[in-house]
Swiss-Prot record:
Biological process annotations from GO: negative regulation of epidermal growth factor receptor signaling pathway
Taxonomic source organism: Drosophila melanogaster
Function: Involved in the negative regulation of the Egfr/Ras signaling pathway. During wing morphogenesis, may function redundantly with PVRAP to inhibit Egfr activity and prevent uncontrolled cell growth.
Ranges that cross the membrane: none
Protein name: EGFR adapter protein
SH2 domain location: 286-379
Length: 421
């Protein structure tokens, strides 16, 4: 049987295809055909072959050239006796890199691979003939210095420090990766901890940093402002109320929440009262600013109707509360809110306004207005002692006059109540 060795050579100057076929006698029991496909970087041939048929490519079209065995071309080169042929590119084709795609060993392989197209290689690429790898895989697997630097940048600072080594690049910014998360990358820029920080082997001593800047760098400006507001409130209250007990609580756990001040039950807050009003109410037995609501209920429940106390409101800051003992049909103790107005004070729901708390209480002790009962002013403790001394001395003391004045006011109140004025 005739074996055909067909080789395709492309001439870059004439663009012609030369077919070289060699015939030799072989054993009649085996029919094999060796076909070597050579593709230039600019043209992609289709590997379609049949018995005695080779498909070649032109710049635009595919042509099928049939060469009968009766008229073989004279061979220019004897085929190599080995089973595998290793073609060498022509010297004129050095400018066009040639890639050997596949070596067909038998006629059966040619028929199986007919109709399949090989991928077009990119111009200028020189892949290995036996190991074809993509540029991305080669770039990832290549141990170049550029890839190492790129991987080190993507890692966290601490992992980056451990990867590079303790003593590697010491004295540069990469040898101090933890400075960026604490106090900044520059020591003399004025940001972060300032110029007095100490660096030991790339790590910053955070104990000597300023608290405000350290908190701002760690938790943000909102937390720093919250702590600053808390410190200012503490200093202000320590100056104004040094003996009062204070308790600080935070409503939420977030850094944006502002600190809240909740006073104790015994705290005395007279910020909304002037000094004259404080001196005026200092000797009043019915004014108990710091008494809580529960204690006022317990104290007034054992008194007769008309007994009252004025305390500071626990629900409305800056306002006062009037706790009044009322007759039995109603609840034992009723609470009225005393509001602060531009003119002074008034009871919520009432129309009349008064210049001071004492004037308001004095008026409602005589004229109950909308209260269920008039306010009963408590007798001062000094009145009883002076009354006993005056009675013992024959009524010549000043205590008797004060007692008589207090009694006349009560009589006047009763008379006005009877007249329903």
């Amino acid at each position: 049987m005739i074996m055909q060795d067909i080789r395709l050579r492309l001439e870059p100057q004439h663009s012609k295809a030369t077919f070289i076929s060699s015939s030799s006698a072989s054993s009649s029991s085996s029919q094999t055909a060796e076909t070597t496909l050579i593709e230039t970087a600019e043209k992609s041939p289709a590997s379609e072959a049949a018995a005695g048929t080779v498909t070649t490519t032109s710049p635009q079209h595919f042509f099928h050239h049939h060469h009968p065995p009766a008229h073989p071309h004279p061979p220019r080169q004897q085929p190599h006796p080995h089973s595998h042929s290793h073609p060498h590119p022509h010297p004129q084709l050095q400018r066009r890199p040639v890639e050997q795609l596949h070596l067909l060993h038998s006629h059966h392989d040619v028929q199986e691979l007919s109709g399949q197209e090989h991928p077009h290689p990119q111009p200028g690429s020189h892949p290995h003939p036996h190991h074809l790898r993509s540029p991305s895989s080669e770039e990832d697997n290549s141990p170049t210095e550029m890839n190492n630097c790129r991987r080190l940048v993507d890692k966290p600072p601490l992992v980056k420090r451990l990867t590079m080594g303790i003593g590697l690049l010491r004295g540069t910014e990469d040898s101090r990766p933890l400075m960026h998360s604490t106090c900044g990358s520059s020591l003399t820029s004025g940001s972060g901890c300032g110029s007095t920080q100490t660096i030991s082997d790339g790590y910053v001593n955070e104990a000597i940093c300023e608290p405000d800047k350290y908190v701002a760098s760690k938790f943000g400006d909102s937390c720093r402002q919250s702590l600053s507001a808390l410190e200012s409130a503490t200093q202000r209250l320590q100056v104004e109320l040094p003996a009062a007990s204070k308790k600080y609580l935070r409503e939420t756990c977030s850094a944006n929440s502002s600190p809240k001040l909740f006073p104790g039950h015994s705290a005395l807050r007279l910020d909304n009262l002037s000094l004259a009003e404080q001196q005026e109410l200092k000797g009043a037995a019915w004014f108990q600013a710091g008494i809580p609501r529960e204690i006022s209920l317990e104290a007034l429940s054992r008194q007769s109707p008309g007994a009252f106390l004025v305390r500071q409101s626990s629900t409305k800051p800056g306002c006062f509360a009037l706790s009044l003992r009322v007759p039995p049909p109603s609840p034992r103790v009723a609470h009225y809110l005393i509001l602060r107005t531009q003119r002074g004070y008034k009871i919520k729901g009432f129309t009349k306004e008064f210049s001071s708390l004492k004037a308001l209480i004095t008026h409602h002790s005589v004229m109950p207005e909308l209260l269920p009962v008039p306010l009963t002013l408590p007798r001062p403790p000094s009145t009883r002692s002076q009354r006993s001394q005056g009675a013992y001395a024959g009524g010549t003391g000043n205590g008797g006059a004060d007692f008589e004045m207090y009694g006349s006011l009560n009589d006047f109140r009763k008379m006005m109540a009877d007249l329903n004025v």
